[in-house]
Regions:
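C-terminal regulatory/oligomerization modules of transcriptional regulators
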Residues: 1-12, 135-156
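N-terminal leader segment of winged-helix/HTH proteins
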Residues: 1-45
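Charged, amphipathic alpha-helical coiled-coil/dimerization segments
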Residues: 5-7, 84-141
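N-terminal positioning helix adjacent to the helix-turn-helix/winged-helix DNA-binding module
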Residues: 16, 47-51, 109, 135
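Alpha-helical linker/hinge and terminal dimerization helices associated
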Residues: 20, 24-27, 31-38, 72, ...
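N-terminal helix-turn-helix DNA-binding core of bacterial DNA-binding proteins
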Residues: 33-78
Length: 156
């Protein structure tokens, strides 16, 4: 393990974990930006990388703002604002249900948007995995094992 130093001489230990996190983040940013650009070309209006990332965590059926907020680690107000924008754009709709909560559903346009995004991702698969020795499932499994190990360490 090597160590670099800041201008003031503070040691900075090299970290493969940091490199992994930065590479994964960069890959996520590049793919999400590519998808949003391609979807805009397909006439899906105003679909930004951040809105696309938000949509990607939703279930195909019923969603609730509180569950979305919990999964994303954000406030319900932030979720409500984003859902309102996606409803305005025609990708989501809110339906009154029992109690205060509203059900959040994809509209037909929203379902087509997600279908087209998945199709574009399958095309990205060709680029990502064509020159690799290992199978995508193996890489995904290894990344999940890393995430599990870090999560376990957090709770011990």
């Amino acid at each position: 393990m090597s160590t670099r130093f800041t201008e003031r001489g503070v040691p900075l230990v090299e970290s493969q974990s940091l490199q992994l996190i930065q590479s994964a983040s960069r890959l996520n940013d590049v793919i999400t930006k590519y998808l949003s650009q391609r979807l805009v070309e397909k006439s899906y209006t105003s679909i930004t990388p951040s809105l696309l990332s938000f949509l990607s965590i939703l279930e195909c059926g019923v969603n609730y703002g509180s569950e979305i907020a919990r999964n994303l680690g954000v406030t319900r107000q932030m979720v409500a604002k984003t859902v309102k924008e996606l409803c305005r754009l025609g990708y989501l709709e809110q339906i009154n249900s029992a109690g205060k909560q509203k059900e959040i559903h994809f509209t037909e346009t929203g379902e087509y948007l997600m279908s087209d995004a998945r199709q574009l991702l399958s095309e990205v698969d060709e680029i990502l995995f064509k020159n690799l020795d290992r199978k995508p499932k193996q890489i995904i499994s290894e990344l999940n094992m890393i995430a599990y190990a870090v999560n376990e360490k957090q709770h011990t």
